[in-house]
Amino acid sequence: MREIVHLQAGQCGNQIGAKFWEVISDEHGIDPTGTYHGDSDLQLERINVYYNEATGGKYVPRAVLVDLEPGTMDSVRSGPFRQIFRPDNFVFGQSGAGNNWAKGHYTEGAELVDSVLDVVRKEAESCDCLQGFQLTHSLGGGTGSGMGTLLISKIREEYPDRIMNTFSVVPSPKVSDTVVEPYNATLSVHQLVENTDETYCIDNEALYDICFRTLKLTTPTYGDLNHLVSATMSGVTTCLRFPGQLNADLRKLAVNMVPFPRLHFFMPGFAPLTSRGSQQYRALTVPDLTQQMFDAKNMMAACEPGHGRYLTVAAVFRGRMSMKEVDEQMLNVQNKNSSYFVEWIPNNVKTAVCDIPPRGLKMSATFIGNSTAIQELFKRISEQFTAMFRRKAFLHWYTGEGMDEMEFTEAESNMNDLVSEYQQYQDATAEEEGEFEEEAEEEAE
C-alpha cells in the first residue's frame, strides 16, 4: 500500500493533528484503543495509508509527534485517543521555542531534530511503498514554524523523491498569540515555497470569520476553529483514505493541482458549515453543496476568490449522490463563472465522489483551489512584516539566536516575488502565450 507518514509539530500542529486522528479514526471505525469496530469493507480497504497494523489486530497511526516543550504532548497523552499513538513516537524537548522561529529552526529545534528523524526513518522503513509525508503545524509560533520547516528540509534531503505535503495554519491579528507572528510566518513561507510540494493554507482569519459570521459564535474558541480544520483535513484526505480514481495519492494530486512549482499554496473550503455539536439535519442537495463550496464565505483562507482566478480546482463530494448530477453542477459552475478560471488550462476542475460521508452529515463537499487570490493572504502578512522590520522591532530575539538580518530581507523579497508570480498568471490570457515562452526561456538561461 502507498503509505503516508504524518508529522505534527508545535502546539497548534499537535492540537489539529490530534483532532485529525480522532476524526479519521472515527470514519474508519477505529476506537480509541486502535481496535476496528466498523461496518464497511471500504473502511479497511486503504487503512494502511495512515495506520500500521500492530499485533492483536490493533491499528496504530503512522504519526510522529514533535514539540519543544512537554505541555501539548501531555494533553494528547491524556486526551480521548491517548492509547492509540505509539509511545516511542512522542519526541519533545523541555526548553520551548518561545514563539521564536530562530529557536525552532537554528538552536533548540536543531538539537532535537536528529531524534525526530530517527523516528521518521523507523516509520519510513516499515513502509511497503512510502508515497510521502504530511506535516500539521502553524506558521505563527516558534516550534511548528521554525522546527517544522527545519524538519521539512531535512526530510527533503533524505527522501528527495517523496511528496511533501503540509497543513499550515496562517496567523491572523484576529486570533493572535504573539506580536512576532508576521516574522515567523514570513520566514516559514520562505522555506515552504522551496521545500514543499503542496501546502494547504488554513487561515486563522478565515476560520474566525466563519465561526463568527456563519456559525454565529460570538467568542470562537480554538476548539471551534479546530473543529473546522478537522472537517477540512478529513475532506481533503478522503481520496487518499478511501478507494477511488481521482487524486488517489499525493503525487497525482500534485500533478493535477500545481501548474508551476512555486505556486503550490491551496485554498481549502468545506460545505456545509456546521458548528460543533449541531451538525445540521436539513437535507442538502448537490446544487446547494456546489454553490456553497465555491462561496468565498466557505473558504478556509481569508481571500476573495472573486478577486483572482483559479489555476486549478479539485472537489471531493462525500455521501450517496448521483455522479451525473455532480458532474452537471460542476460544469454549470464553470460555465456560469468562466472568467474566474484561467482559460489557458482547459478542464482545470476535477471532481471525486466518495460514498462514505463524514460523521453527522448525509453529504458534504470539500474544495481545494489553487487560486491567484491567495496572494491576498501573503500580502497581508507581508505588510505586517514590513511595518515591524522597517523599524527593526523585535529583531534582537532572532539575531540573538545567530540569525542575520539578511535572512529577513531574503524572506521578505521571496514572499513579494511569490505575490508577483500569482499576479502575473492572474493577468495572463491565452493570447499572450508567445510572450510567456520568451520570458520562460530568458529565466531558464
Curated annotation (Swiss-Prot):
Short sequence motif named MREI motif, residue ranges: 1-4
Gene Ontology, cellular component aspect: cytoplasm; microtubule
Cofactors named for this entry: Mg(2+)
Residues at which GTP binds: Q11, E69, S138, G142, T143, G144, N204, N226
SMART domains the record matches: Tubulin (SM00864), Tubulin_C (SM00865)
Gene3D superfamilies for the chain: Helix hairpin bin, Tubulin/FtsZ, C-terminal domain, Tubulin/FtsZ, GTPase domain
Organs and tissues of expression: Highly expressed in testis.
GO BP annotations listed: dorsal root ganglion development; microtubule cytoskeleton organization; mitotic cell cycle
Acidic residues biased stretches: 429-445
Major place of residence: cytoplasm
Alphabetical list of Pfam families matching this protein: Tubulin (PF00091), Tubulin_C (PF03953)
Keywords: Cytoplasm, Cytoskeleton, GTP-binding, Isopeptide bond, Magnesium, Metal-binding, Microtubule, Nucleotide-binding
PTM comment: Some glutamate residues at the C-terminus are polyglycylated, resulting in polyglycine chains on the gamma-carboxyl group. Glycylation is mainly limited to tubulin incorporated into axonemes (cilia and flagella) whereas glutamylation is prevalent in neuronal cells, centrioles, axonemes, and the mitotic spindle. Both modifications can coexist on the same protein on adjacent residues, and lowering polyglycylation levels increases polyglutamylation, and reciprocally. The precise function of polyglycylation is still unclear.
Function summary: Tubulin is the major constituent of microtubules, a cylinder consisting of laterally associated linear protofilaments composed of alpha- and beta-tubulin heterodimers. Microtubules grow by the addition of GTP-tubulin dimers to the microtubule end, where a stabilizing cap forms. Below the cap, tubulin dimers are in GDP-bound state, owing to GTPase activity of alpha-tubulin. TUBB3 plays a role in dorsal root ganglion axon projection towards the spinal cord.
Family (UniProt): Belongs to the tubulin family.
Subunit structure: Dimer of alpha and beta chains. A typical microtubule is a hollow water-filled tube with an outer diameter of 25 nm and an inner diameter of 15 nM. Alpha-beta heterodimers associate head-to-tail to form protofilaments running lengthwise along the microtubule wall with the beta-tubulin subunit facing the microtubule plus end conferring a structural polarity. Microtubules usually have 13 protofilaments but different protofilament numbers can be found in some organisms and specialized cells.
Protein name: Tubulin beta-3 chain
